[in-house]
Amino acid sequence: MRHTIYTLTLMACWLAIVECQAQQIVNRKYDNVTLSEALLQLNNEQTEYVVNFLYNELEDFRVTATIKNKRLPDAIQQMIGFYPVRMTVKPDDREIYVECTHKTDRHLTGTIIDEQGQPVAYANIAVLNPSDSTLLGGGVSNESGYFAIPYEQAKVLARISYVGYKTVYRLCDKAEVGTIRMQPDNYTLKGVTVKGQRLLYTSTDRGLQVSIQGTPLEQFGSANEMLTHLPLMMSNGEIAGHGKPEIYINNKKVRGEDELERLRADEVKSVEIITQPGTEYDAAVSSVIRIKTVRRTGEGWSGNFSGAYRQGHEHYESVNAALNYRLRNGMDFFARGYLTDNNTQTVKTTDEQLQASSIWNHRKEEEYKYHMKYYFADLGWNWEINDHHSIGFTYTANNYIGDRKYICANDMQTMQDGMMWDEGHSTTTTLTKPKLNHSINAYYIGEIGKWKVDFSADYYNAHSQNEMSGGTEGETPVSSSTATKNQLIAEKLVITAPVPIGKLTFGEEASTVDRTSDFTQSGFSADNHIRQQTAIWSVFANYSLKVGSLSVNAGLRWQNEHNRYELDGVRNDEMSPNYHVLIPRLSISYQHSPWTHSLSYQCTRNNPPYSILSSAVTYTSKYEYNSGNPFLQPQTNHRVAWKSQWKWIYAEAIYGYQENVYHSIRSAYDDVNHPGAILTDFRTVPKTQYYMIVLNATPKIGIWQMNYSVEFAVQDHDYGELGIAHNWHGLMTDFTFDNTFTLPHAWMLNVTGSITPYQKSAYWINKTTGSLDLRLSKQFLRDKSLNVALVASDILRTKYDEGTAYGGIGYRNIFRLYRDARRIGFNVSWRFNATKSRYKGSHAGQSERNRL
């Protein structure tokens, strides 16, 4: 027995030695040596690969790096860094090829240092034509401040820039530039001189570019939480002045917040906030957030695990896990899972008045409870074949665990003309039965010659079964059932074509939707069977041109929509309109550091959600019913905006004009058979307009990073055609104060406050409301891969919705509502061997998915 154990031990040691020899590990430190010398040394010291390169071609590129426990391809990739150098690995032949991507005889070289003589890493060097400042090439300095950039002209203009430092221009007539010293760019804030530091964001011709890596933003646990602390983000999750954004992660459309919860903030390199999206986005999109993750090399297993818990009146908890296995040839296999137990409570008091044949008053104390257990899982594969081609595929499934439960309970007193008419307790329970939903996404992104192709296709299939039961105590119970089936097929193609001047992008997008809804009830209204079919096909083109400091972007989208609406098996032509519309977008930008200005026009078009196009009347309580309106038309929005930015100060003025705006409205349901009952449905307002100013400031003083945003808006709505007499034009304001303190030993404190002062606008009056949130976090382990955070929201319990609304015909409502916002909890997340996802697919037909 001992002999057997001894033999097995020797065999294990021998196999380990063989494995280590087969996959030799590189541990080495380089200090300002040429890339050619480093490659030659690595080639001579190992036998796993043969490294092929041209010595003279790479001699100008110098390496300063510390390599620890890396295989040879990963070590070479780290040495290459941001240089215009490409590495090709041929594992079958055990060969590595390293070559410069720009075949020129000249390399512009130099070293960048700061005011204290320390090297400046990752500074941007742009090589310009001295005659017209057109961009000829560019690069980034390495860890020792050294840069080497291929160029061809005899004389060039070098522009060296780094956030927080003054930009340096150097006219170069020889390859060796020498040492360039950069000076901080200082500014004064209330008498305090603040020396140049990295700005939280920079301006682009489409919006803002926010750096996440290396800033306090990377210490927020999840990407979802991190996004709430970006510039221009308001407490309601919208971009100030631009509504709810569409979100992409590495070109893949985000389907829900659970995807953002699974992505760690420290895996994000940068975020682009697009407030002027082109026509390649859907006609309904008014703003976009594009997340770019940190690209890491490596093979084998990687993953992350996280959990969250919140406790208020009800509790919330979630866990998620992601695993990825990467092969040497760039192929990834991944699986993700997410599980949540979400419970919420809303309490509300209302005093409703309805003027019909009599004056009815309903005084209610209401409680809404929501209980849901849910899982999300997907399996996928993607293959980055080479630098020019990548493909991928993802299957996603999600479902409820048990019934999703929504309970509405209220105590109501009803008075007619000042006299007591009725009182009682009412309870309704709506159960959503578990139904497995499926979706499939596939994509191809590639370059064919000078043409770039981005293609994606989607299939989505979802069923739901809702069952409502309840009523008022002592009276006949009511019940209803709604069975819904949704199916979507969509595809999208975007092509970037080579043109002599500027950039041309064009493509097409198509989607088909088949939706059925079967509604049955116990006698309080009428049964119906509705089938809605929609086919949308669009073509679009964008052209952009940059001349010096001036940029012009123009785009046009032609959208064709065909609808078929069937009620109880019979087509209704009036409810089946066809549309053929043009969606134009235009922006002109001027950038001259530190100023950026832009003028833009944007047209968007929003189709009503399918759920409000139903004519079914559903039951809420004895005196409350709900319905939709199948005659609603798409809403068209026109927006003109002027934006200016100076360093960390942002300002924007917006004018908006809207057509066919759909609103919910309340009126008498049936004054004869249901006296005093209120019906909520949807109507169209022909036109509205609004004026808005958005301000944002993101200064940094030492450890204190500020991010303050404010909205000022005035609305000019005319609801007279709906029978609503009130039309106020009061100022609406919204303030967000986000403060992040970076503390020693990987601690971070965030204090965020928001306040919405008293508002009197359109047909409502809202009282002042606000909240105060805290987050204290710490990163653990040597690589800071473990993050633990204590979080508290709405500490002062001030986030009430309170006011008076006249949103109906002869209708008034005085209300006070609280959504269980005060909670305390914690987040824990851990990642290992983080080889970031290469999945690049986006989603076609996304607006139709949102409507479903």
Which residue ranges define each predicted feature?
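N-terminal export/assembly leaders
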Residues: Q21-K103, S133-G137, R198-L200, S235-E246
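Short, acidic, small-residue-rich periplasmic hinge/interaction motif at the N-terminus
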Residues: L39, E45-Q46, Y83, D92-D105, ...
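N-terminal periplasmic accessory domains that precede
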Residues: E95-C100, K174-Q183, G191, A223-M226, ...
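Short, acidic Ser/Thr/Gly-rich low-complexity loop/linker segments typical of extracellular
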Residues: S131-Y146
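Short acidic/polar hinge/loop motifs at secondary-structure boundaries
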Residues: A148-P150, H229, S235, N250-G278
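Face-selective signature of the C-terminal outer-membrane beta-barrel domain
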Residues: Y374-G402, G424-D568, Q591-T596, I649-A653, ...
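Outer membrane beta-barrel strand-and-loop segments of large Gram-negative receptors
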Residues: L488-K492, I536, S627, Q633, ...
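Outer-membrane beta-barrel signature, preferentially recognizing the C-terminal barrel domain
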Residues: Q532-T534, E574-P577, R605-E659, I678-Y691, ...
